UniProtKB/Swiss-Prot annotation:
Subunit composition and interactions: Homodimer. Forms a heterotetramer with IscU, interacts with other sulfur acceptors.
Sites bearing N6-(pyridoxal phosphate)lysine, chain numbering: K206
One GO term describing the cellular component: L-cysteine desulfurase complex
Entry protein name: Cysteine desulfurase IscS
Alphabetized InterPro entries for the sequence: Aminotrans_V_dom (IPR000192), Aminotrans_V_PyrdxlP_BS (IPR020578), Cys_deSase_IscS (IPR010240), Cysteine_dSase (IPR016454), PyrdxlP-dep_Trfase (IPR015424), PyrdxlP-dep_Trfase_major (IPR015421), PyrdxlP-dep_Trfase_small (IPR015422)
The protein's required cofactors: pyridoxal 5'-phosphate
Keywords from the named record: 2Fe-2S, Cytoplasm, Iron, Iron-sulfur, Metal-binding, Pyridoxal phosphate, Transferase
Function: Master enzyme that delivers sulfur to a number of partners involved in Fe-S cluster assembly, tRNA modification or cofactor biosynthesis. Catalyzes the removal of elemental sulfur atoms from cysteine to produce alanine. Functions as a sulfur delivery protein for Fe-S cluster synthesis onto IscU, an Fe-S scaffold assembly protein, as well as other S acceptor proteins.
Residues noted as binding pyridoxal 5'-phosphate in the record, renumbered to the chain: A75, T76, N155, Q183, S203, A204, H205, T243
Location in or out of the cell: Cytoplasm
């Protein structure tokens, strides 16, 4: 077993060796290096063929038409393109957007930008279980609502929203529905033929593909129009200009092909690993699971250890690669905005750790990690005067702290 142990699969995944092999074939002079937009010679034709094959592979994972897949640089760009693209195209129809307080920053900050441009955004509060229900969405809908954007799987707590039910609601009201599915490909079944979803964002690097490549699903029937945000040669039917990165696109295609093939057995294996891990740390007192345990992907366990500071716990767990909050915001020392939205107090939000498991996690690693967590939490609590007070029966919420 090699240390440190990687338990941060929701931040990024390593590239699957099969994906790396396919990518390496699209780089060198004797490989498939051409520009897919070169129409006049075989190098371009071969590259275009590889790109279109990958487009099919991405479409097949989510049961879409390949013509509905637009290549982007990742889920952040896909979120921007979907939300700004719809807002700008349909602004004559209305200027109201609905999203939730626990979306990824790529959605929240895009909405903030649109607010500066004169759009109005409603931010929904999730329930304590971290779920956004159709009832919450319905209560926020207005006559001038043009777009609802709700994520499929939350990146911090792994909860799975009922996008099928939300889609039925938005379609019946004539409102477009965007879903950020960066964390759900290869973990949750997605059938865009059945789902009433109009736009969906994908990322390769959360699904054992390379970083720097993603895609946006844009529905053809009923047709969804978006305004391109990147201007240039008119690639991707005018929705996203820029020379296509064949090697990355091929990597994403292969990663999604593998995901489709191996999802069922991998989910079962990862669920067994998570249950095994949780069973070994469950004996700790004052341990709280963040988010629903029933509507949740098997890869995620987000736990708060009361009376332990999350950052100090991460430092104590130097052999484990884990995180507090999402990779995109964990550099700030503010408590997780996702956990605050669930109603967790600052102390519990600060004491949370996200463990995320994946394709290369082993039982041996799980057992070692669980043992280290129990040791570190117990040791840090021994050092904590707050823990002593709690054990003596002091109600810490009633204590008045004073500066000296």
């Amino acid at each position: 077993m090699k240390l440190p142990i990687y338990l941060d699969y929701s931040a990024t995944t390593p590239v699957d060796p099969r994906v790396a092999q396919k990518m390496s074939e699209c780089l060198l002079m004797d490989g498939n290096f051409g520009n897919p937009a070169s129409r006049s010679h075989v190098f371009g034709w071969k590259a275009e063929e590889a790109v279109e094959n990958a487009r099919r592979q991405v479409a097949e994972l989510v049961n879409a038409d390949p013509r509905e897949i637009v290549w982007t640089s990742g889920a952040t760009e896909s979120d921007n393109l979907a939300i700004k693209g719809v807002a700008h195209f349909y602004s004559g129809k209305g200027k109201h957007i609905i999203t939730s307080k626990i979306e990824h920053k790529a959605v929240l900050d895009t909405c903030r930008q649109l607010e500066r441009e004169g759009f109005e955004v409603t931010y929904l509060e999730p329930g304590e279980d971290g779920l956004i229900t159709p009832a919450l969405v319905e209560a926020a809908l207005r006559d001038d609502t043009i777009l609802v954007s709700v994520m499929h799987v939350n990146n911090e707590i792994g909860t799975v929203n009922d996008i099928a039910a939300i889609g039925e609601l938005t379609r019946s009201r004539g409102v477009l529905f965007h879903v950020d599915a960066a964390q759900s490909t290869g973990k949750v079944e997605i059938d865009l033929d059945k789902l009433k979803v109009d736009l969906m964002s994908f990322s390769a690097h959360k699904t054992y593909g390379p970083k720097g490549i993603g895609a946006l699903y844009v529905r053809r029937k009923p047709r969804v129009r978006i305004e391109g945000q990147m201007h240039g040669g008119g690639h991707e039917r005018g929705m996203r200009s820029g020379t296509l990165a064949t090697h990355q696109i091929v990597g994403m295609g292969e990663a999604f092909r593998i995901a489709k093939e191996e999802m069922a057995q991998e989910n079962a294996r990862v669920l067994a690993l998570r249950d095994r891990f949780f069973a070994q740390i469950d004996g700790l007192e004052e341990l709280y699971i963040n988010g629903s345990m029933t509507s949740r992907v098997p890869h995620n366990l987000n736990v708060s250890f009361n009376y332990v500071e999350g950052e100090s716990l991460i430092m104590a767990l130097k052999d484990l690669a884990v995180s507090s909050g999402s990779a995109c915001t964990s550099a700030s020392l503010e408590p997780s905005y996702v956990l605050r939205a669930l109603g967790r107090n600052d102390e519990l939000a600060h004491s949370s750790i996200r463990f995320t498991f994946g394709r290369f996690t082993t039982e041996e690693e799980i057992d070692y990690a669980a043992k280290k967590v129990v040791e570190a939490v117990s040791k840090l609590r021994e050092l904590s005067p707050l823990w002593d007070m709690y054990k003596e029966g002091v109600d810490l919420s009633q204590v008045e702290w004073q500066a000296h």
